[in-house]
Regions:
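Positively charged n-region of N-terminal signal peptides that target proteins for export
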Residues: 1-4, 19
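Sec-dependent N-terminal signal peptides
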Residues: 7-8
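Feature marking well-ordered beta-strand scaffolds used for ligand recognition
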Residues: 18-310
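C-terminal motif of bacterial Sec signal peptides marking the signal peptidase cleavage site
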Residues: 13-16
Length: 310
């Protein structure tokens, strides 16, 4: 599911998305309003704030209102990291899946002005600043940098209950690769790609999830480089040699230099083939990228180039 939510579920400025020991945190202190009207005083859930004079509540804005905000303390967590979404095909309800230092939170945002915190799936092992979530066939697939975490599989149909603030349990734990930084899923093929684990030098690990409750590793790829993030698609771009092939676009780091993109044919999971590797100058940290809808362009996001180079 590729959806863009303009509901600000929470603010997670504390931790950067990349795992680097020397990550910097930038503090922005402007003369902003200090309070927003709460819709739930007991739980400090903040209500709607219109974008006026470039500010919605305490946040800069440009043409978008802040519909609501759930602070981290409502989840009884200290840090947030990543988020994904799920739309229930049975009733059209929309949910936010929020990565936390101690687990994953599930929030019903069908009415974005009155979000409902449904509960948390605790981390499989210990806390970590890094967690990533993707969805396939009404299941959430979750990895974390927490040691020994592996892959959690969670049946999202549990969210159809009217109960709130529950503590959930995962349906499956695949512990074959330990910790990992990221996960990508190609819904067309039913394969997940675990990224930045201890296997394959941190390269992608191929996991068959067509049966979500029975995931299993079928292979992987090592280019002697760490894959931080990836997008995997059934390619329908201008290069006819790879039409309908399953192609991985990876944001990589090689030899400590965080400046690489790899393009990999993963159609045959037993025999993945490198199509191209690209390195660029003035790099800070090759963080993530996304293809245009026509698969003609890959838009790369470097996390730190403006910070370290200017």
């Amino acid at each position: 599911m590729r959806k863009l939510f303009f509901l600000l579920v929470l603010v997670c400025l504390y931790s950067s998305c990349s795992k680097k020991d020397n990550d910097e945190v930038i503090s922005i202190s402007d003369d902003l309003p200090e309070t927003i009207k709460n819709i739930d005083d007991d739980n400090n859930i903040e209500g709607k704030s219109y974008c006026e004079n470039g500010i919605a509540g305490i946040y800069p804005c440009n043409g978008y209102d802040l519909l609501s905000r759930i602070p981290l303390e409502h989840f009884e967590s200290n840090e947030g990291n990543d988020s994904w979404g799920w739309t229930d095909s049975l009733n059209g309800k929309e949910y936010a899946l929020m990565g936390l230092d101690d687990g994953t939170a599930f929030v019903d945002i069908s009415n974005p002005e009155i979000p409902l915190y449904l509960g948390k799936l605790p981390s499989a092992t210990v806390n970590s600043s890094w967690r990533d979530i993707k969805v396939f066939k009404d299941y959430a697939f979750i990895v974390s940098e927490a040691p020994g975490h592996g892959l959690q599989v969670f049946d999202l149909s549990k969210l159809r209950s009217d109960k709130t603030e529950q503590i959930f349990e995962s349906d499956v734990n695949l512990n074959a690769f330990g910790n990992a930084h990221n996960i990508a899923i190609n819904e067309d093929s039913g394969f997940a790609y675990v990224l930045g684990s201890k296997l394959f030098d941190g390269g992608p690990v191929f996991i068959d999830i067509n049966s979500p409750l029975n995931p299993y590793i079928v292979g992987g790829y090592s280019f002697s480089s760490y894959t931080h993030d990836a997008q995997v698609v059934k390619y329908n771009g201008p290069d006819i040699r790879f039409k309908e092939k399953e192609i991985l676009f990876g944001s990589n780091s090689i030899g400590g230099e965080n400046n690489q993109i790899i393009i990999l044919d993963v159609t045959d999971k037993k025999n993945p083939e490198l199509i191209s590797s690209i390195e660029y100058s003035n790099a800070g940290y090759t963080h993530q990228g996304w293809l245009s809808d026509d698969h003609k362009y890959f838009f790369l996001g470097d996390e730190l180039d403006e910070l370290t180079i200017g």
